[in-house]
C-alpha cells in the first residue's frame, strides 16, 4: 500500500452489503482483472521485446534533457492524451481524485477497490488529497509491473462486469476512470513539449490486439508508465460514451481525414512545437487506428488551450523548472474535469467532448455529424449555453490563457455547473424581484453601483464571445464551422443565439427595474438632450441613431430643468413656461438632483391587465391574422372554440407562425423523430425559462393545429377564400375593420366606466363590449318596459348575434386580460422582453422594431399593460406625513389639491383627481388619443425602462382629421374618431403628410407635462411604472365646456359633470371673491342657466307636469316629503345617474321613468316625449329650482359687475319672493351640491 494511504481493516463477509458490491465478488473480480492485466503484459512483451530497452532509454533521457529518442510516438501519444485527459473526468462515471503515487520507485500497491462510490462534484475540489510527486526514474524492466498503481473504484468493476465479453472492454486496468493531479498534468504537458524528435520503431511497437483496437497504444512494453496509463485510463470513458452515441464508421473516416490533415498542418508550420511534428509522424505510422489518434490529438490541443498552457511557452523550459512547476502549481483542472453527464437517460456531451468536436470539424472536407448527431432535443437545450461558450473559448484561448482561466474559475465549462448557475441566477433575480418592482431613483443608483462587478459575468454568460475579449478568433472559427459542417450549422447557430436571448430576457427587465435604464441607457445615448433645452434635435438624432430618414422631420419637445427654487409649485412653474412650450403640445421636466422620492409599491397588489396585439394596432388585417382566421374557422367547423390563444410562460403562442415553421421542418412526425421540438420552441421565441414549454407546445399543436395541418392544400385554399369573402362582406356592411369599435352603440352603454382616463389608452371597454354591460344591468330590466322604450336595443343584440362569425372580433386589438400580481406581471414582462430581443436594447432599437411589427404584421406579438387606481392600491409617491417629499408640490398625490387647479372642487374622482399607475412592459402602447375632456395632465416615471412619447399639438387638429380620414379610408367616419379607436399611425407617415409630430424619451425620475387638446402616443421600452394625474387651470374651463357638449353629442360618457364643476366653482369662489375665476365662468353659467330653464319649459309644455326635488338636505321641503318613501334609485351615486341615450351625467336635473328606473337627460326626454306622444310614467327630478339657479347666477354676475362696473350681462328677474329665494340659495351647503346621496325626496304633481 502507499504510505499516504493506509490499508483499511477489511472484514471478510460472505453476504451482500448495501454499499458497493459483495466482498466475495470483489475478490473474484480482482483476480480476474489481475489475470487480464498479466495476459496483456505478456502479449506486449512478446510483441515489443525489441523495443523495451529503447523505450526505457527514452524515458530516462526525457527526465534528463529535452530529447526523446527511444520512447516512440506511441508513448508520446499517451502523454499528449494525458494532457487532454486531465481535463476529462466524467461527472457521473469518473472520479476527480488522485489516489496514487507518481514515483515509479515507490512500492506498488496491491490492487484494491474502494467500497463506496466516489462522489466528485462539478467545480469543487476532489475528496481525496493530492500527492506530491517526486521526480524519480522509472523502474527497471525486470521489476514486477503486472499490477497497476491505480486504486480502482467500484465504478471500474461495475464497468468491467458490464463490458465483459464485449469488444468495448479495455485491455488493461489503466484505462479505467481514476482521475489524476493537476501537477501531473503540468509535468506531462511539459514532457510532451520537450520531445523534439520521434523514432520510427513505433510502427512495430503499436500492434493492436484483436480485442480492442483503440487502446493498444498506451502500454508499450509491459510497464505502466505514469503518463500513458493515466491518460488512457482517463480517455476510456470518453470512448465508451462515444461508442454509445456516435456512429463508429463515420468516426473512423472523419478521424482518418483529420489525422492526415494534421500531418499536413504540422509539416506546413515548422514553428510549432516539435512534439506536434513527432506526433504527426507517429500518426502517419499508425494511421490504421484513427479514432484514438483523433481523440489524443484533439483533446491535447483543446484542453491545453482551455487551461491556458501553451506549448510555445514551455519549449525552452528545462526539466527541472517543469518539475518545480508540477509540484508547486495549483490544480485548476478540477474545475473542468467533466466528460459526460447522464440526464434523463440521454448522455449529454460536455466541455472536453465538445472542444474535441469543435476542433475536429473544421478539418473535414465533408460535413460530418459523427459526434453529436444523436443528441436529443432536451439535451441540446439544456447545454446550448455551454456549447456556445466552447465555440467562443476555442478561439479565445488561442490568444490568451488567463482570460480563459478566468472563465474556467467562474464555472461555465460544464453543463451541470452551467445549469446550477442558471438556477442560482434565477434565485438571485427572485430575491431582487421585490426590490426591482419598486425601486426609486435613489435605490436605482445604489443598485447600479452594487451590480457593476456582477454585470460582466452575466454578459459573458449570455454572450461569451463579445465578453471574452479575443473575439477575432471566434468569428473565424465560426466561419470555418459554417463552411465545413453544413448540416449542423443551422441548429448550432440557432442554439448559440437562443440562450443569449433567454439570458437577456431574464436580465433586461430586472436591470430596467433596478435603474439601469436610468443610468446605462443614458450612456448609450447622447447626453445633450437633458443638458440643453435649445438643442432638442441633436439629442433626438443621437438617440435614434441609424433611424430612417423620414424620422428626421420630428422635432424634440422642449426639455426643462427647473432650479430648486422654481421646482416648488408645478402649476406656477408650468404657467410661467406655457407660452414657450404649449405650441409643442408637451414638455419634459427634469427635476433637480435632490428630488428623489422613494417609490413604494406593494409587490403583491393585484390588477386586471389589458392585452394588446401590437401587430394589429395599425391595420387590423395582415398575413398572420389571415392565417389565424383560417385556423379558427376550421376549428369552429370541428366544434372547437378558441376564445384565447394558448399561453406559454405568460406569452401568447403565435399559432400561424407555429403552423408555418412546423411545416417547413417537415411536419410534426419529423420534428418528433429528429427531436427538434427545442429548436422549434426557440424559433417561436418561447422563453427558455417557461415551465414545461415543450409539453405545452406539443399540447397546443395537438389541440389546435393537428386537424388543420392534416388538411390538403386544396382545403387550405378553400378556407382562405371563405375567410376573405367573409371579411369583404363585413367591411361592406360596417366599413373598414379599423373603424369598428368595441361598443359601436355608445348610446346604449348602460353603466359608467370607472377605469382611469388619461387620454392614453382612452377607456377601452371590456372585450365582450356592450353585451357584457347589458348583462350587468340585469335580466329583469330587459323583460319589462325597457323593451318598449328601447326597441332598437333588441336590434343591436340581434345584429351581434348574427355577427358570430369567425371575424366578429378581429377588429379588436386590445382585450381584457386577467388579474395578476405585480410580481407576476414583472416576470411576464421579462419573458416577453427575452422573446423580442436577445440583449438589452436601446430605445432606438425598440422603436424601430415596434414600428416594423405594426407595419408588417407578419408575426403575433401580444403584450400587457395595466392601470391601477392609487385610491385602492396606494400611490408610488410617499404619503406619510413624516416621509420626505410627502408634501412636496410635485408629489402627484398633492397636486389635485393645489389651489391653482380648479379640479379640486370635484372632490375624489377616479381617473381625474385620483392619480393612477400605468404599468407597462416592452411595446406596451398608449395609442394616439387625447383626453376626452381635453384636460392637461402630468406623468411621472417612477422606475423601470424608458418611455417614448409622440405628441401632436392641438393646433393640428383639423389637418390631422383630414389626413387620418384619407389614410384609414374612413367611409363617412370622422378621422379623429377612427384615430381614437386604438389605431397607431407611424409618426413618419404623419410627418410626410405635413403634420407636426414631436418626440421625446422619458427616463426614470422625469416628468412629462401634456397640454390641453394635444394628441399623444406612448411606447414603453420595458417594464416600467409611472403615475399620472390631471390638473386644470381657469383657462381650461371654456375648452372643457365645449368638449362636454361635444361628448354629449357623440354619446360619450364623461367621468365627471361639467355642470357640477361650474356650480361648485361658483359656490366656492363667490365666497373668496376671486374675480378672475368668476369672470371666466360667469359667461358659462349664463349659457348653462339659459339652456336648463328652456328645456324645463319645453317639457312642461309637452305635458310633463310631474316633478320632484332630490339632493336637498335643508328643512325647506314640502309637507308631502314625509308621505312618500325615498325610491331605491335615488340612493345611487351621482356618477351612475346617466342618460340611457347620450350617456350624459345628469347633475342639475333628469327625467325618470318611474316604473323601470330609466334616466333621461332633459334633451333626450324631450325627444322621447315627442316620439311617444305621451308622458306617462315620466317625472322630472331637479336639484335646484328655477329661482335658485337664477339667484346663483345673479350672485356671480353681481360680483363680476362690481369689479367691472357693469351688470348688463347678468340676467335678473326680480320677483316678490326674491328674499326667501335668496335665503334658500345661500343656505345650500357644498355638501348638498356634491349629491353623493339623498336622504329624502319630495314628489308632487301639478
Curated annotation (Swiss-Prot):
Domain JmjC: 884-1048
Ranges of biased composition (kind: Low complexity): 86-98, 1234-1246
Expression by tissue: During embryogenesis, predominantly expressed in neurons and particularly in dorsal root ganglion cells.
Extent of motif Nuclear localization signal: 104-110
Family matches, as Pfam families: ARID, JmjC, JmjN, zf-C5HC2
Biased composition (Acidic residues): 180-193
Keyword Transcription regulation applies: yes
Skewed-composition ranges (Polar residues): 117-129, 197-210, 369-384, 521-531
Annotated Gene Ontology cellular component terms: chromatin; ESC/E(Z) complex; histone methyltransferase complex; mitochondrion; nucleoplasm; nucleus
GO BP terms, alphabetized: cardiac muscle cell proliferation; cellular response to leukemia inhibitory factor; central nervous system development; chromatin remodeling; facultative heterochromatin formation; liver development; negative regulation of cardiac muscle cell proliferation; negative regulation of transcription by RNA polymerase II
SMART domains: ARID, BRIGHT, JmjC, JmjN
Location(s) in or outside the cell: Nucleus
Basic residues composition-biased segments: 1-11, 211-221
This protein's record includes keyword ATP-binding: no
In-chain residues carrying the UniProt-annotated modification Phosphoserine: 78, 455
Chain intervals for the UniProt region annotation (Sufficient for interaction with the PRC2 complex): 141-170
Single Gene Ontology MF annotation: ubiquitin binding
Motif interval(s): GSGFP motif: 874-878
Domains as described in the record: The ARID domain is required to target the PRC2 complex to its target genes. The GSGFP motif is required for the interaction with SUZ12.
Protein's name according to its UniProt entry: Protein Jumonji
Organism: Homo sapiens
Amino acid at each position: 500500500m502507499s504510505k499516504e494511504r493506509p490499508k483499511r481493516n477489511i472484514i471478510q463477509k460472505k453476504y451482500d452489503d448495501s454499499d458497493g458490491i459483495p466482498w466475495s465478488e470483489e475478490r473474484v473480480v480482482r483476480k480476474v482483472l489481475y489475470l487480464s492485466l498479466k495476459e496483456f503484459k505478456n502479449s506486449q512483451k512478446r510483441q515489443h521485446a525489441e523495443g523495451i530497452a529503447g523505450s526505457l532509454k527514452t524515458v530516462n533521457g526525457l527526465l534528463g534533457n529535452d530529447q526523446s529518442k527511444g520512447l516512440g510516438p506511441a508513448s508520446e501519444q499517451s502523454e499528449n492524451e494525458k494532457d487532454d485527459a486531465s481535463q476529462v473526468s466524467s461527472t457521473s462515471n469518473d472520479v476527480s481524485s488522485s489516489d496514487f503515487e507518481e514515483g515509479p520507485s515507490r512500492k506498488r500497491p496491491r490492487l484494491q477497490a474502494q467500497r463506496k462510490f466516489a462522489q466528485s462534484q462539478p467545480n469543487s475540489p476532489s475528496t481525496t488529497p493530492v500527492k506530491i510527486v517526486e521526480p524519480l526514474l522509472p523502474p527497471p524492466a525486470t521489476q514486477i509491473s503486472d499490477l497497476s498503481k491505480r486504486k480502482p473504484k467500484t465504478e471500474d468493476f461495475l464497468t468491467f462486469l458490464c463490458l465483459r465479453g464485449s469488444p468495448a472492454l479495455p485491455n488493461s486496468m489503466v484505462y479505467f476512470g481514476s482521475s489524476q493531479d493537476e501537477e501531473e498534468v503540468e509535468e506531462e504537458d511539459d514532457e510532451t513539449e520537450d520531445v523534439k524528435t520521434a523514432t520510427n520503431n513505433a510502427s512495430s511497437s503499436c500492434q493492436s490486439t484483436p480485442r480492442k483496437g483503440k487502446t493498444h497504444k498506451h502500454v508499450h512494453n509491459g510497464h505502466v508508465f505514469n503518463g500513458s496509463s493515466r491518460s488512457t485510463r482517463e480517455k476510456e470513458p470518453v470512448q465508451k460514451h462515444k461508442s454509445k452515441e456516435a456512429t463508429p464508421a463515420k468516426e473512423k473516416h472523419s478521424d482518418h481525414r483529420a489525422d492526415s490533415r494534421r500531418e499536413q498542418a504540422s509539416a506546413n508550420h515548422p514553428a510549432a512545437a516539435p512534439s506536434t511534428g513527432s506526433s504527426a509522424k507517429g500518426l502517419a505510422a499508425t494511421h490504421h487506428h484513427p479514432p484514438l489518434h483523433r481523440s489524443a490529438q484533439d483533446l491535447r490541443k483543446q484542453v491545453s488551450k482551455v487551461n491556458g498552457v501553451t506549448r510555445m511557452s514551455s519549449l525552452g523550459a528545462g526539466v527541472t523548472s517543469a518539475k518545480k512547476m508540477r509540484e508547486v502549481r495549483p490544480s485548476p483542472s478540477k474545475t473542468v474535469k467533466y466528460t459526460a453527464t447522464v440526464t434523463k437517460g440521454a448522455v449529454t456531451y460536455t466541455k472536453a467532448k465538445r472542444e474535441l468536436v469543435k476542433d475536429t470539424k473544421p478539418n473535414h472536407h465533408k460535413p460530418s455529424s459523427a459526434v453529436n448527431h444523436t443528441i436529443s432535443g432536451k439535451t441540446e437545450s439544456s447545454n446550448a449555453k455551454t456549447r456556445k461558450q466552447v465555440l467562443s473559448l476555442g478561439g479565445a484561448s488561442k490568444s490568451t490563457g488567463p482570460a480563459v482561466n478566468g472563465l474556467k474559475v467562474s464555472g461555465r465549462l460544464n453543463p451541470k455547473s452551467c445549469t446550477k448557475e442558471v438556477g442560482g441566477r434565477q434565485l438571485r433575480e427572485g430575491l431582487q424581484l421585490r426590490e426591482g418592482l419598486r425601486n426609486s431613483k435613489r435605490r436605482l443608483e445604489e443598485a447600479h453601483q452594487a451590480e457593476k462587478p456582477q454585470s460582466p459575468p452575466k454578459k459573458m454568460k449570455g454572450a461569451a464571445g463579445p465578453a471574452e475579449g479575443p473575439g477575432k478568433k471566434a468569428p473565424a472559427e465560426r466561419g470555418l464551422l459554417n463552411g465545413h459542417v453544413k448540416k449542423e450549422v443551422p441548429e448550432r447557430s440557432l442554439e448559440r443565439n437562443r440562450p443569449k436571448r433567454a439570458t437577456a430576457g431574464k436580465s433586461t427587465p430586472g436591470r430596467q427595474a433596478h435603474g439601469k435604464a436610468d443610468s446605462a441607457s443614458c450612456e448609450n445615448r447622447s447626453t445633450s438632450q437633458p443638458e440643453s433645452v435649445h438643442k432638442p434635435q441633436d439629442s433626438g438624432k443621437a438617440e435614434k441613431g441609424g433611424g430612417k430618414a423620414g424620422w428626421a422631420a420630428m422635432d424634440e419637445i422642449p426639455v426643462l430643468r427647473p432650479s430648486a427654487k422654481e421646482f416648488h409649485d408645478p402649476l406656477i412653474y408650468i404657467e410661467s413656461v406655457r407660452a414657450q412650450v404649449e405650441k409643442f403640445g408637451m414638455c419634459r421636466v427634469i427635476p433637480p438632483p435632490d428630488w428623489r422620492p422613494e417609490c413604494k409599491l406593494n409587490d403583491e397588489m393585484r390588477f386586471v391587465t389589458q392585452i394588446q396585439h401590437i401587430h394589429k394596432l395599425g391595420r387590423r388585417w395582415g398575413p398572420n391574422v389571415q392565417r389565424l382566421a383560417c385556423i379558427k374557422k376550421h376549428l369552429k367547423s370541428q366544434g372547437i372554440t378558441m376564445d384565447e390563444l394558448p399561453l406559454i410562460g405568460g406569452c401568447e403562442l403565435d399559432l400561424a407562425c407555429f403552423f408555418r415553421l412546423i411545416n417547413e421542418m417537415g411536419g410534426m412526425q419529423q420534428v418528433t423523430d429528429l427531436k427538434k421540438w427545442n429548436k422549434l420552441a426557440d424559433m417561436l421565441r418561447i422563453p427558455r425559462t417557461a415551465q414545461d414549454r415543450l409539453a405545452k407546445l406539443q399540447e397546443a399543436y395537438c389541440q389546435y393545429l393537428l386537424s388543420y395541418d392534416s388538411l390538403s392544400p386544396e382545403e387550405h385554399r378553400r378556407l382562405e377564400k371563405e375567410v376573405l369573402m367573409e371579411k369583404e362582406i363585413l367591411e361592406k356592411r360596417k366599413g373598414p375593420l379599423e373603424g369598428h369599435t368595441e361598443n359601436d352603440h355608445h348610446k346604449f352603454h348602460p353603466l359608467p366606466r370607472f377605469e382611469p382616463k388619461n387620454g392614453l389608452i382612452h377607456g377601452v371597454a371590456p372585450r365582450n363590449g356592450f353585451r357584457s354591460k347589458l348583462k350587468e344591468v340585469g335580466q329583469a330590466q330587459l323583460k319589462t318596459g325597457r323593451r318598449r322604450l328601447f326597441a332598437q336595443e333588441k336590434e343591436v343584440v340581434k345584429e351581434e348575434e348574427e355577427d358570430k362569425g369567425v371575424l366578429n372580433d378581429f377588429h379588436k386589438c386590445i382585450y381584457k386580460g386577467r388579474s395578476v400580481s405585480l410580481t407576476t406581471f414583472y416576470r411576464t414582462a421579462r419573458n416577453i422582453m427575452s422573446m423580442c430581443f436577445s440583449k438589452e436594447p436601446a430605445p432606438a432599437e425598440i422603436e424601430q422594431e415596434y414600428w416594423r411589427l405594426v407595419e408588417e404584421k407578419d408575426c403575433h406579438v401580444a403584450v400587457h399593460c395595466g392601470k391601477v387606481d392609487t385610491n385602492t392600491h396606494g400611490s408610488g409617491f410617499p404619503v406619510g406625513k413624516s416621509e420626505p417629499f410627502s408634501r412636496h408640490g410635485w408629489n402627484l398625490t398633492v397636486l389635485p389639491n393645489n389651489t391653482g387647479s380648479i379640479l379640486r372642487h370635484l372632490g375624489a374622482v377616479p381617473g381625474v383627481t385620483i392619480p393612477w399607475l400605468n404599468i407597462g412592459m416592452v411595446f406596451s402602447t398608449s395609442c394616439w388619443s387625447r383626453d376626452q375632456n381635453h384636460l392637461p395632465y402630468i406623468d411621472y416615471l417612477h422606475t423601470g425602462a424608458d418611455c417614448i412619447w409622440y405628441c401632436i399639438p392641438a393646433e393640428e387638429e383639423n389637418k390631422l382629421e383630414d389626413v387620418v380620414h384619407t389614410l384609414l379610408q374612413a367611409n363617412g367616419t370622422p378621422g379623429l374618431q377612427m384615430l381614437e379607436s386604438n389605431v397607431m399611425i407611424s409618426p413618419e407617415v404623419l410627418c410626410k403628410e405635413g403634420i407636426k409630430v414631436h418626440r421625446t424619451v422619458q427616463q426614470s425620475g422625469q416628468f412629462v407635462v401634456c397640454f390641453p387638446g394635444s394628441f399623444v402616443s406612448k411606447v414603453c421600452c420595458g417594464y416600467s411604472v409611472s403615475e399620472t394625474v390631471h390638473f386644470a387651470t381657469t383657462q381650461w374651463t371654456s375648452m372643457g365646456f365645449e368638449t362636454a357638449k361635444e361628448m354629449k353629442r357623440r354619446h360619450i360618457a364623461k367621468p365627471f359633470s361639467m355642470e357640477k364643476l361650474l356650480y361648485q366653482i361658483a359656490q366656492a369662489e363667490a365666497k373668496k371673491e376671486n374675480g378672475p375665476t368668476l369672470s371666466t365662468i360667469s359667461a358659462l353659467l349664463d349659457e348653462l342657466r339659459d339652456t336648463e330653464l328652456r328645456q324645463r319649459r319645453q317639457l312642461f309644455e309637452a305635458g310633463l307636469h310631474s316633478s320632484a326635488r332630490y339632493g336637498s338636505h335643508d328643512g325647506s321641503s314640502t309637507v308631502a316629503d314625509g308621505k312618500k318613501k325615498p325610491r331605491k334609485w335615488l340612493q345611487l351615486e351621482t356618477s351612475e345617474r346617466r342618460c340611457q341615450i347620450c350617456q350624459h351625467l345628469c347633475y342639475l336635473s333628469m327625467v325618470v321613468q318611474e316604473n323601470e328606473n330609466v334616466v333621461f337627460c332633459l334633451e333626450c326626454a324631450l325627444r322621447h316625449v315627442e316620439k311617444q306622444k305621451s308622458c306617462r310614467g315620466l317625472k322630472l327630478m331637479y336639484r335646484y329650482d328655477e329661482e335658485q339657479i337664477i339667484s346663483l347666477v345673479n350672485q356671480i354676475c353681481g360680483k363680476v359687475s362690481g369689479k367691472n362696473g357693469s351688470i348688463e350681462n347678468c340676467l335678473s328677474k326680480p320677483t316678490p319672493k326674491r328674499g326667501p329665494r335668496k335665503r334658500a340659495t345661500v343656505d345650500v351647503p357644498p355638501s348638498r351640491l356634491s349629491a353623493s346621496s339623498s336622504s329624502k325626496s319630495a314628489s308632487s304633481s301639478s
